[in-house]
From Swiss-Prot:
Disulfide bridge partners, by residue number: 32-56, 33-72
The protein's name in its UniProt record: C-C motif chemokine 4 homolog
GO terms, biological process: antimicrobial humoral immune response mediated by antimicrobial peptide; chemokine-mediated signaling pathway; eosinophil chemotaxis; inflammatory response; positive regulation of cell migration
GN (gene name): CCL4
Subunit record text: Homodimer.
Family: Belongs to the intercrine beta (chemokine CC) family.
Amino acid sequence: MKVSVAALAVLLIAICYQTSAAPVGSDPPTSCCFTYISRQLPFSFVADYYETNSQCPHAGVVFITRKGREVCANPENDWVQDYMNKLELN
């Protein structure tokens, strides 16, 4: 009986430790852009996009190509803004 109570106590402590290890509401960035594509992608290659997390060191737009590749682009470029607007309308 003492073994099972001890095991239960250790398990409970481990669970409590895991839940308190990360601050509440922390959302680590899943992908960040550290370099941008140097040329404009053909719009016909682009299937979707998402913006990088605000916790990333640099703002970025990640275009997902029709082949499933992810390409980082500078959100300050005019063509990037144009593609984002076109994709939002579809």
